[in-house]
Amino acid sequence: MVSEDGKIKPRVPTRLDRYPAKMVSHLAERLIKKYASRCESLLDPFCGSGAILAAGSRLGVPVTGFDVNPYAVLLTGVKLSGFCPQEAECLRQDLFDLAARGDRSLPIAWDGKEYWFSAATLAKYEQLRFAARELGLNRSRAGKAVLLAVALSVRLCSRADQRSPKPFISKRAAEERRGRHYDPYRQIERLLGELASLYGKGQAKALARVFRVDLVGAQDPPKYDGGYSHVITSPPYLNAQDYYRNFKLELRVLEGIIPFNADNLQYRFIGTERGHLITRISETEMEQHYELVPGLRKLANSSPRHAAVVHRYLYDMGRALKTICNIVKPTGTCVIICGDNLVGGMHIRTWTALNTLMSQNGFALYDGFSDTIQNRMVPPTRQGHKGLIKQERVSAFRRD
């Protein structure tokens, strides 16, 4: 976003698509045209908000997306598949009618819920959750659109500061939102109308599929015609726990309507800072990580916890990339978009480490360029979260 004086201003994410700095449409389209002009089948194994898949789908390419985040799968699925606005509107009315009876609810199993929502708002969401499950909204395209509208309303109806992609209750939000009731029904109806104007005109030109897949533990992820001719993806950042934090409110509301466990999910995001990070990592693997990231051994001595975050990221990404490489066709192309990171005060060239992991899986680098991120920063800057990525590296590989 550029102001009148020509200076770049941080972009506040929109209400309908605020996935944190994962991919932007102009870069997605550039990558498709540059590397996948003759694409037979395209996979984005970390699809996020689906920008890569949407760009490929517009060209009539069969696209497949994976993501561990149920919210990302829901959002991208609605984007790619489209839905019938009239059918969705009927389902929305059924949802409201069933929930408004007030005699049944599906409680949110989370101790923090009363901190984030007023009692009246919380009661309405728990009634809506019961109605959504009873109506099976997750089983149809129109139902998923209604469910996405429910999820999109959650932040708007919470006590959270609306300026940041990550929910927190600032002093300003506490003062401005205290004692006010934010009605989910009104927000859901408006949001569904906005979704219909964008995605209610039919479905993708070609086959478009989105699956919830944990690539670290995946045994046999879905394939297209024996494999994918092209993979284009922006993997999670090294300190990517924000992908969970940013959507923890929505995930708590969706849990039980969509089959997943939020308590377990927070540990499955690549880049997590939670839990026992190095329990499964052997000494041999740690030594390999020290080779991948110069300075990691020094970081381990000065800040073991930060070093553990790096170890866990490299461990998880190593397994994820191996899984990805195994489902690319022998003549396939793989494009990785990744930036640097700042962890514990240490500057890490994450993309260099991932490029090495790709070469270890039999892929050779044949092209690349840098993409400056001047308009993807999000306010406000908060203590402990100043490691904003200023530039990403695009690296294109073919099988060696």
Predicted regions, residues:
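Acceptor-substrate binding/catalytic loop of class I
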Residues: 14-18, 108-120, 306-315, 337-352
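Conserved S-adenosyl-L-methionine
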Residues: 24, 31-100, 187, 193-222, ...
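Core SAM-dependent methyltransferase catalytic element
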Residues: 329, 382-400
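SAM-dependent nucleic-acid methyltransferase catalytic core
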Residues: 125, 130-233, 238-247
